[in-house]
Each structure stands twice: as structure tokens, then as C-alpha cells.
Amino acid sequence: NYIGRASRDMKYRFNWNAPIIWSQHEPNTFYHAAQHLFKTNDQGKSWKIVSPDLTRDEDEKQGNGGGPYTNEAVGAENYGTISYVVESPHEANTIYVGSDDGLVHITQDGGESWIDITPKGLPETIINAIDVSPHDKATVYIATTRYKFNDKTPGLYKSTNYGKTWKNISGNIPNGAYTRVVREDNKRKGLLVAGTELGVYISFNDGKKWELFNLNMPVLAITDLMIKHDDLIIATQGRSFWILDDMGLVRQFDGNSNTKLYDPENSTIGNWSSELNSNNSDGTSSFTGVNPANGVVTVSYTHLTLPTNDQ
């Protein structure tokens, strides 16, 4: 029973969002994390510890209900936990781990040994997301968050050598738009998308310059995002999902040309039927939606000089 217990008295300290991932390289293998990293090769029937404590493990920050930073009496909130785990898509046995108290570690031998690769001078912070570049096995990005310390400064970092050195790429993201996630596009190298407290930011030059990319979204706190099937999929703190359908035009944008002819995505002609299609005799018409227009939809933007008079 964890209700009202101090974190220091628990064998394992799990984060509220304790990470669990499946291995891209080993069948039936998953990783889960508390202050240690656990591994199963049999779909969870048995687990083994494959890391030491990868947090700061500071006793004074492991009080009742996870205090002082994560006070929550039922024992589901703790501090000094692993907050993010990611396996390299390029190399088996290469795993990055981040903690909610600001440490980053890497193993390149499946957990036999670990190296502290925390950026020098990084203050105590939540390592909220880690993203291995889909284009280069040695490049990795992290998103840090310090709102629990009343610090709303964005914190995005990039390494090109497995975390040996880091560069802050937060650039011109404004104070207040503190960061929770950053991803690199899987087709255009250097195209980054970041989720912040104030919405989505995009960079076409690997973080040198950022632009607000909310489009038709209201101001939203972004908790996670990913690029899948050429779509940008966004999760918000308000428990909603937003999808930007087709990243193709974004990938082609060069930011310089006044005139640009974009290549449209390939169109798919569908021909199918569904049991939900009916004449409402069985009450299923409520499931009927409106399909997109047939053919290719063409959108053009034209720069116009407006007249200065009322005509």
C-alpha cells in the first residue's frame, strides 16, 4: 500500500508517466522504468534490472507523497524517477534514459554499462523527451522542462556524438513557451517540430530559428507529438489530438522563394463498402460522414497589393 508513504520507503520509485517501450530490435522485448530500467524478453512474464539508479537519488526530495515537488498523497507521484526511455532505431542495445531530476544516461551494450551524458551546466530539470535522429545514429535531441521550479524557459538540446557534447537549440522560442518535446522529421533532415506550453514551433534549419506553427489551433499546451505516415500528430494537455494531414508541403518549404510550385501527395482512389452505410433502417445513419472531395484539390496563395482608397 503506497498511500501516504514516503518515496524513500518504496523499493521502486515510478513516475506518474512511467515510461514503457517495446524494442525495435528484439522480439517480445519491452523496457519499463522506475529509478532503474527494467527489461523483459517474454512480454512481461518476468523482468530483470538492467541499470543502476539513474537519478540523483536525493533523500531530502523523497518525502511523503513524493514531496517536495510532486506532492500527491496516494503514492502515484514520486520524484527522482526515470521520465523517458528511448531505444536507438539504428543500433540494437543503444538506449537513452532521462530522469525527472535532470540526468541523461546512455548504454551502448544493452545495459551492461552506463555513461552519464547530462549536458554540462544543465540545472535540475525534467528530461521530458529524447529523440534519436532518424538520419544519423549519433545525433540525439532532448527537451527539458523546469516549470516545477517556476522556470518557464524553453530548453532544447542537440548532440551529434552520442551525448558527449550538447548545443542549446532553443533559439528564439520565447520565454513562457517552455518545452516538452522535440522531434526531427523522418524525411527531411534538420526539420524540427517542438511542442511547448503555448503550442507548436517549427524549425527548418535544425533549431537555428523557430516559428510558431499553431495554424488553426488555439493556444494549447502540447504534451507530445510524432510524425507518422507523413502526418504530424499532436497530443495536448487538454487530452485532445490534432493532426496535420500530410507533411509533404512543409517538407518542400524553403523559406526563401516568392514563388513555389509544390508537388502534391499521391492520390489514392478508394472503392469499398461498409456495414455502416445504410438507409437508416437499422439506425446507423448517425455514423455517416462527409467524404473529402474527389480528385486533386489545388490551393494557391497570391500576394496582392491592396488599394489605398475605398474603391
Q: Which residue ranges define each predicted feature?
A:
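Beta-propeller blade termini and top-face loops
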Residues: 1-286, 293-294
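Short edge beta-strand/loop segments characteristic of extracellular beta-sandwich folds
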Residues: 297-301
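Conserved small/polar residues in nucleotide/adenosyl-binding loops
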Residues: 302-308
